[in-house]
Amino acid sequence: MTKKTVPVQVQSDLLWEPRSIFWGARLQIAREFRELTQKTLADKVSASPALISLCEAGIKSPSLDLVQAFGEVLGFEPEFFSHEVGDLFHEEQCSFRHRRSAQERVKAKIRAHATLIGMVIGRLKSLLRFPSQDIPCFPLSRGTASEVEEAAESCRKHWKLGIDGPLMQVGRVFERAGVVIVPHLVNTTKIDAFSRCGPTAVIFLNKTIKSPSRWNFDICHEGGHLVMHGGIQTGSIETERAADRFASAFLMPKRAFSRDFSMGDAADWKHIFAMKRRWNASAAAIVRRAFDLGLIDAVRYRKAYKQMSFQKWTVKGEPEEPAFQEPELLADALISLGTRVKVTIDDLRQQLHFTPETFREVTGVVVPPAKLKLSPVIPFSR
């Protein structure tokens, strides 16, 4: 977990230095983004692990050449370390899907990545108009299924979505509420998604998951954490089950879903996949929703999952997936640079003091090469 540090003076006897303040929290963020231990970083910059620890804690001031070495190894310009972290992503604000099976190193990398994305978004918000954050708060007092169902329906009503039909653009619903969806979570099978509720609300999705119906469910699952679990440590069986139930109820409201499901044969896969096309949810989520609502019994539920396992849908993915919906908010904002505002993508990168490669890794956007500026040529007199 990244702790708040105080700035220290950079030690240098060089004639020029970009800035003399060093923030250790930024060093920890950059190191964790690269998944390096303090010892590994120390070896790469020819320092001791103890010195790295003291620099991150704000106790020891690094020399300028060490700051430059940090930047070269971690992929940041030296000036990156001379600014305070305005919006640090703390562990208690973050929710990880499949958190219990994930290594702390991976979770630390994702939190660091999210903090860096927050820096990008903060700059973009100073240049462009973003949707105001409008996440309703429906904390659970009892944690019952009926309470979660009520929270999901209340959230739909708050956003004026109604509870009588499916959602056509699931990601857009949350982005209109000011939640930034980032589609390139670190490449891992241990975490499906990640979210954070704070001054900048974000949902990260796993780019290795190729199922749009699973993405829809993951967005709503993380949305459930944002709506129900603000300020609460998540990752327990209880909070994960509540978020799953929220996602199911938000995607497929009880009354409308029950009506549609009852119009066909519960044992007919053609009916299940027709429901999938209509509700933009996976067949697995539909079967589970039907079981939770008492529309099928335990025997039918277990038979359905056995059939899905036999077809290898749980491993290779289901057929008849809905069309993929690319998140829009962050991409549109970055595309607007250099057109709607004078600041270009490379200007933004330089303001953040990321290297071009780091900017691509953080945002998923390649920095275009700077245009060559031609100087006027003064002809020789003849």
Model-based region annotation:
Residues 1-382:
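Active-site hotspot residues in diverse enzymes, especially metal/ion-binding acidic/histidine motifs
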